[in-house]
Amino acid sequence: MLELQNITKHYGTKLALDHVSLTLKNGIYGLLGPNGAGKSTLMNIITGNLKPTSGRVLWDGKNVFDCGAAYRSLLGYAPQQQGLYDTFTGIRFLSYMATLKGIPKKEQKGEIWRVLDYVNLTEKAYRPIGTYSGGMKQRILVAQAILGDPHLVVLDEPTAGLDPKERVRIRENIRNISGDKIILVSTHVVSDIESIAKEIILLREGKIVDHDTVPSLCRKHGDVQNLEQVYLQVFGEEEIHDGSHTI
C-alpha cells in the first residue's frame, strides 16, 4: 500500500503541491489535471526522485526516503519520452536498465524477452531506438518500467503525442499489467484513462479536488455521462484533451 500524508512542495515561493494526502492499493489509478496542476511534481515525489518540503510518502508503513534501494527495487517508472538512448538497440537499452535495477545477469535474458513480448516489440528488439516511432518509444519505456515485475508502476503521460492506434495499444498494455500491482498513470488525455482506471484522482493547482471511481465522479458532478464532462465541471474551460483535439 502506498500512502501520501500531507505532501507539500515549494519551489522557492511557488507552491506546487498543497497538503496532498492519498492512499493507493492494488489497481490502476489515473492522475488527471490540466498542465501546471502538479502532476509531474507529485509523481517525482512518489518515485523518490524529489523530496517534499513537508509530509511523508509511506510504502507499507515505511518512509520511502529512508528505504533507498529497497524501495527502488519495488518501483517501475516510465517518464515521458526522455532519457532514451537513441543509438542503443531496444534489447541493449533493456539490458542496461535491467542491470541498473539489479536483476541478476542469469535472469536478464528471459526477463527482457518477457517484457518485449508484453509490449509487442520482439521484432524490433535489435533496431536502434532512434528509428522507433513515437508509439514504439513509449512502449519500450513501459517495458523497462515493468522489468523485474515491480509492485508499483508509475507512468508519466504514456500516450502523449501518439496517434489513436498507438494510444489504444498503450492502454491495452497498461490494462494488462494490473493484478497485484499499484499502477499510477498521469495524463491530461481524458479518454486514455477513463476506460482502464479503477479510480481517478483530480488535481488542480497542487490540490486533490476529488478522488473516486468514474461512475461516482459522474454522479457527484452534475450526474453527467462521462469523465470528459466531469473534467469540464471541475476545471471549466481549462485545457482538456479527448485524445484527438483540445477543447
Task: Annotate the PLM regions.
Residues 55-66, 70-71:
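Conserved ABC transporter NBD signature motif
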Residues 47:
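Helix-to-loop junction immediately C-terminal to a conserved catalytic motif
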Residues 153-157:
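Catalytic Walker B motif of ABC-type/P-loop ATPase nucleotide-binding domains
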Residues 95, 99, 106-124:
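Conserved ABC ATPase "signature" region
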Residues 211-212:
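ABC ATPase "signature
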